[in-house]
Amino acid sequence: MEKRRAVKENYPDIIDIWSKSVEHTHDFLEKDDFEQIKQVIPQYLDVLDVQLWYRHGEIIGFSALSKDHLEMLFLDPFYQGKGHGTTIIQIMINEGLKTVDVNEQNLGAYLFYKARGFRQIGRDEKDSEGRDYPILHMSL
């Protein structure tokens, strides 16, 4: 597994991976919300530590951190369920990752992080933009 810091030229690949992954894992997300979020992702990427993750020279996903908090981890659906997310999370934990937030409706993500040692420490009724998607705060 190899990681490289993302640059603006990588944003189209990042948006593509985000779109495919969210369509695969976030069936609770309304189409309008999906489109709104997709439009603002570049603004978030500009202020986060964004890494592209590669396997055998192929981009398989990306992560975005704010200090020790994981803001985003998305893998291309083709690479999900094959241990790559676990490898990436372990690397980030070794580098200081401490917290993550997940959508309550995304049971797969919740169970993924729980199995890797994260525990729920809080809950918000709405996401950071005030949408009706409860957020679970998790910490090691």
In which residue ranges do the predicted regions lie?
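A short beta-loop-alpha structural element at the N-terminal edge
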Residues: E2-D16
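Conserved GNAT-fold acetyl-CoA-binding loop/helix
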Residues: D16-P42
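A short helix-loop-beta-strand connector motif used in the catalytic cores of GNAT acetyltransferases and
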Residues: V40-L52
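Conserved beta-hairpin
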Residues: D49-G61
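A short, internal acetyl-CoA/4′-phosphopantetheine-binding micro-motif in the GNAT/acyltransferase core
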Residues: H69-Q80, V102-N103
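Conserved acetyl-CoA pyrophosphate-binding loop and the N-cap/start of the following alpha-helix
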Residues: Y79, G83-M92
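Conserved GNAT acetyl-CoA-binding A-motif
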Residues: N94-N106
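C-terminal "cap" of GNAT-fold acetyltransferases
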Residues: N103-L107, R116, G122-L140
